[in-house]
Structure formats: C-alpha cells, structure tokens
C-alpha cells in the first residue's frame, strides 16, 4: 500500500476508459496505474459458489481487477496466470482448499450465483493474503479481469504528498465532469483498523462494567 493513491472514477465506455488510463500513465510522477472494484482492505464484494446441482456451498470474496493489479499490489500467483477473458477467474489457496481440488486446480469450473456471467474457468491460483483486516480469518477469494475504472489505484513517485496534490489537481482539470478525490491507501487501511479498535475498546469497557456490577451484587 506504500505510495499508492486510490480514487473512484466511473467511465461511460471503452474509449473514455482508454483516454483516462493513458492520461494517468502519462503523468511524470506516476509509476503504475491499475484498477479494481474494491481495495483489499475494504473486504471486497461477495459471490455465492454453487455445486453442480445449483445448491449454495459457500460465500466467497469477489473482486474484478485489471490484469496488472495483483502484481502492482504484491499479490503473488502460485501457479497459472491472471484472468483475461470474461469467463476466466483466479482463485486463492483457501478457495481451492474449500473446494477440495487438491493439486489439480487449473482448468476447474466454478459455478456461481451471478447468472449473467455463467460458469468460470480457473486459470490461476493466488497465494493467500488477507482481505478486510488481520482480525478477519482468511477468506476464500475469486478474481475476474475487468475494465479500467471504479477504484483506481496509482503508485506515485516520491515526494508522495506533493505528487498526490498534483494528481488531484491535474485529474480534476482533465475530468471536469467527475468528482476527483484521490487519497492514500494507507489512510483507508488505518481507518479500517481504527474502527476495529474502537469496537474492541467498547467491548472491553462493557465487560469491565458487567464485572463491576456483578461484584457489587455479591458485596451488596
């Protein structure tokens, strides 16, 4: 997440997407530009995985990403390649383990609840990494390749803060009809953990209060 800026931008068609991507790539302080439907720290969306009879087996985390996104974010492929076609998918090790595929993973077919997609062919396996936060147990994940847009991730050169300001300024000028607000991915990760910390502290406080009430009852 270091030196990565994130911002949400939607594009009307492929031509607009191509223009936008070339714009970002052409900025002198930009190293890499990719996109995903959600950053990993958000927890991603969900997809219900079905068996051959159409019965739900489990819910998997689900994300749509550009082909180079995993490499940009340091997500390592254990085998195979990133999905490129609409009906292709990459799964993580936990997903394959839940499906009991053993070592024969590539070429497997995933039946899912997204009827508009149809079955997905597994072309790659990602090594496990945490989505949401480290407080959340390892989750199954399935990834498809998607078009540029939604949550845009841009790795900036140093000085990061200065270049982030330039990015927001120049992108706002380039896309006057859109709301441009790039921010550090690390900031979003810190906010996600702060929510967990507040909940944890509130839980501990509630437990202490309950214990105090019980002790008062015993004494009284």
Residue ranges and their predicted role:
Residues 14-32, 93-97, 114-200:
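"Rare, low-scoring activations can occur
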Residues 104-117:
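Short conserved beta-strand and strand-loop elements enriched in small hydrophobics
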Residues 1-97, 114-118, 191:
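Structured, solvent-exposed hinge/loop segments at the ends of secondary-structure elements
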Residues 59-66, 104, 206-210:
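Short, basic, helix/turn surface patches
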Residues 197-220:
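Hydrophobic alpha-helical transmembrane segments of multi-pass inner-membrane transport and secretion
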